[in-house]
Amino acid sequence: DYSSKFNRFTVFSKNEIPIYYAIKLNFIDTEIGILKRHMPIRVIDNYKVAIRPVEFDDFSRILNMPKVNAGTIEYNSMMEYLTVSGMSLTELVTMSDEYYGAVKTEIQNLSRSNNLFNSLDKCRQLIKSNAAGSNILRYILLKMRHRIMRYQIADRPNNWISYLCLWNECIPFDRMPFDASLVYHNPSLFDIFSCISSKGREHEILSRKIRINTEQNIKLFTPIKDVEYIGNVEELANKFNTLLISKHVPVRSLVIEKDKVYIKGYEADTVTIINDLISRVGKGLAGYRNAMGTWLQETPTVDCEEKKSILLDMFSKYDLALIYGAAGTGKTTLIKHLSSYFADSSKLFLANTNPAKENLRRQIKVSNSEFSTIASCSPLVNGNNYDIVFIDECSTVDNAAMKELLKKLNCRLLVLVGDVYQIRSIKFGNWFSLARYFLPSNIVYELNTPYRSKHSSMVELWNKVRSLDERTEEYIAIQHYASELDDSIFVREDSDEIILCLNYDGLYGINNINRFLQNDNQSPAVYWDSWIYKVGDPVIFSENNRFYPTLYNNLKGWIRHIKKETAAIQFD
């Protein structure tokens, strides 16, 4: 339920392993040859579907039916059936009467308990009659995950959803599963297609297409001609809008205008944010330029002419500043200089992620400063009026979060910092890339000089990549920055070097490559749960407030000693 991408490991099997339910498995450790080296791998030699008791407890609570006992023959026979057949419970309850009846009879002839099939019978009856809640049941039967179901369970039967114990917030998914979510859960399109027919749901698919185009491609307005293959766009949009529950109409409605279609809420949020920023432009601080000039003369640590020019100009005419720049161009350094200048003023530093917040906290040691993530800043911004607020990582802040923040934020000066080429916000966020085009040009500052490398050819490569120069590959080849992948990557040339991987999973993912590299460590292996640790292994700490500030995100170290006991393990 709480698995981390850092804690997954890859196993191999000659069989197609069921992907929807929890399984029990046995695996053996062995090796394969890759790049003239031995890579440790794990191979599954036996497995069985084993939906956990907590998941059947959730299922029974949703149906308001007696609990299914995982110790019964009925339960174990069903797990055996799911393992051998490879079917899902959704497929089983939607089978013909003859097939379903045969499976039910075979299992019940072996068992005295019938709680499981009583629950499946109720699901089958609701699904076959297409009753309210049937699409939710189809999906739950497919997934049966505690981390999904626990958020859907209401404390009493809901008459709007066939008296199932489900919250009203589940209703949008039941009505339009191809373009709605459950409570705290966004089903994948693959899973939806696996359990619900798309016939007659073209209006949902149209809305989903527009939403994905907006959120993932940052394309607020989609040309109608791009989605005409789905059907009559105007008719589908009207059908979608009429099926929305009333509180979602201002946010999710599809709007057609000038041969374009867009989602009303996304457009409205963008306009709201831009208008709010325009209202904050102001007229600057009286005497700021002279005061900053004096401070710069007395502060020899500011030795960059680019930053001096920006600092002199920043609040001389306006109360708002936007700072754009790639990694390593000195955005944080500029924030540090401003913080020092405003040392006696109240300051709030906000970032979208905890690592970025902690980085600011470590870098900026100035009095009258508070630090927070945007998600946790309400206690700080509600009712408070700061002299200056800094918001870092702006390109990763989605529109909805920024709109809500600006509603509550009271400050004399506002500094927005980010890189439009950085990883985008998870949800739709176009405000930071658009803001510069709607605000006075002389409140927008761009840092262009990278300071993390003085190697001119590396800087040139960086510039080509950022500008999507079509000659980038040619330049990489000329400078010999790329080579054939071979076993030289496993020869350590520096104690602090790393290998970058494209993902966490798979044969060449971070987790598997870590095991590959660990194989070179000749220290004795210490086994704990499904993991192997060795003295001398390098470690990196992920987000953990348990020992902050002694241990912080991305802190690096090495295992020097391991003490293993019966129920505990200690690392030095």
Which residues does each predicted region cover?
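N-terminal accessory nucleic-acid engagement/regulatory domains that precede
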Residues: 1-287
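Conserved phosphate/pyrophosphate-binding and hydrolysis machinery centered on Walker-type P-loop NTPases
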Residues: 263-267, 304, 350, 506-507, ...
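Conserved adenine-nucleotide phosphate-binding loops and their immediately adjacent elements
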Residues: 286-299
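Pre-Walker A adenine-sensing motif
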Residues: 299-317
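Conserved helicase motor core of P-loop NTPases
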Residues: 309-311, 421-552, 556-560
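ASCE P-loop NTPase helicase motor core
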Residues: 312-316, 321-477
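ATPase/helicase motor core of nucleic-acid motors
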Residues: 400-414, 534-535, 542, 549-550, ...
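Short aromatic-glycine-enriched beta-strand elements
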Residues: 565-569
